[in-house]
């Protein structure tokens, strides 16, 4: 049974990864989670200099979810390179570094610094909604999305994932802009907007199918995220066309979520005698 997926030439042992900002840089969860079981660890955002983050309180529970405004607090690239990369290299999982910045130059500085480090991919965060400078300004203007993507690609030695903001009128426009700028992969929230898939029948749960932006709108691999807490959630995203999934908020209330989801996908494949997880990707159209 094959659970491996490939993103921009990088092979992951399974399609389950952590969502940036919900898993630290791996060490924080390593007592609960065998990081070797994950397709990839996506680190918390890393900037060129330390960021203090937003004032407290930063987190509030709401019905059905959680509000957070951490502000991308991080110790900066120097500490990350010395402390976090050596820790992650102990594990048999891919390392994806989330890069944040306030200007194009900030992003480029981090990308260049990571060029010779043993990391597998870069995720460029232009989607964070709670930093007053940078982040969201890039993510809401298609010309800016294309420009920052092109600049990052020009300086990057690793494949580039562009993490897009959901807070736009049409995320397809932003996705196409990132594609035009040379992105290798996209991270997208709400891939399944307004859609429910019956994973047992592998078809839409209702006849009047509708959905988000997975499919032919862009030709790049998509990492789906947003509300993934169970294997069934992950399978829906895969069947809708996501090449991999990121697990976020679920990590806060269930530190075992990522491994449980990976195991759940394997159990589903055994139950339905599916030899290759890639057979599930985009199987519902």
Which residues does each predicted region cover?
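Alpha/beta catalytic cores of nucleotide-metabolism and tRNA/nucleoside-modifying enzymes
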Residues: 217-218, 223, 229-285
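Alpha-helix-loop-beta-strand connector modules within alpha/beta enzyme cores
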Residues: 67, 71-92, 139-162, 205-222, ...
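Alpha/beta enzyme core
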Residues: 31, 35, 102-223, 232-242, ...
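Conserved, mostly hydrophobic/aromatic
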Residues: 18, 41, 80, 97, ...
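Acidic-and-aromatic substrate-binding clefts and catalytic sites of carbohydrate-active enzymes
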Residues: 24-25, 105, 253
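N-terminal capping/small domains of soluble enzymes
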Residues: 1-95, 101
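Short gly/pro/ser/thr-enriched loop/turn and capping motifs at secondary-structure boundaries
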Residues: 47-52, 129-131, 193-196, 252-254
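Active-site metal-binding loops of divalent metal-dependent hydrolases
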Residues: 21-22, 226-228
């Amino acid at each position: 049974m094959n659970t491996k997926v490939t993103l921009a030439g990088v092979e992951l042992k399974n399609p389950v990864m952590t969502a940036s900002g919900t898993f630290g840089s791996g060490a924080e969860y390593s007592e609960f989670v065998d990081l070797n079981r994950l397709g990839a660890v996506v680190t918390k955002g890393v900037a060129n200099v330390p960021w203090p983050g937003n004032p407290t309180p930063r987190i509030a529970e709401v019905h059905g979810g959680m509000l957070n405004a951490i502000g991308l607090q991080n110790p900066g690239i120097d500490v990350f390179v010395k402390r976090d990369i050596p820790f992650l290299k102990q594990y048999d999982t891919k390392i994806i570094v989330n890069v944040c910045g306030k200007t194009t130059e900030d992003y480029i500085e981090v990308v260049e610094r990571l060029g010779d480090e043993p990391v597998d991919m870069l995720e460029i965060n232009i989607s964070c909604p709670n930093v007053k400078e940078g982040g969201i300004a890039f993510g809401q203007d298609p010309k800016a999305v294309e420009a920052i993507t092109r600049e990052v690609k020009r300086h990057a030695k690793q494949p580039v994932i562009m993490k897009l903001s959901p807070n736009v009128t049409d995320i397809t426009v932003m996705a196409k802009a990132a594609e035009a700028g040379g992105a290798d992969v996209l991270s997208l929230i709400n891939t399944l907007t307004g859609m429910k898939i019956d994973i047992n029948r592998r078809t839409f749960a209702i006849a009047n199918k509708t959905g988000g932006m997975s499919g032919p709108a862009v030709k790049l691999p998509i990492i789906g995220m947003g509300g993934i807490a169970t294997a069934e959630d992950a399978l829906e995203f895969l069947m809708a066309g996501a090449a991999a999934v990121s697990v976020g908020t679920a990590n806060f209330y269930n530190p075992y979520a990522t491994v449980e989801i990976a195991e759940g996908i394997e159990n589903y494949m055994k139950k339905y005698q599916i030899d290759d997880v890639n057979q599930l990707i985009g199987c519902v159209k």
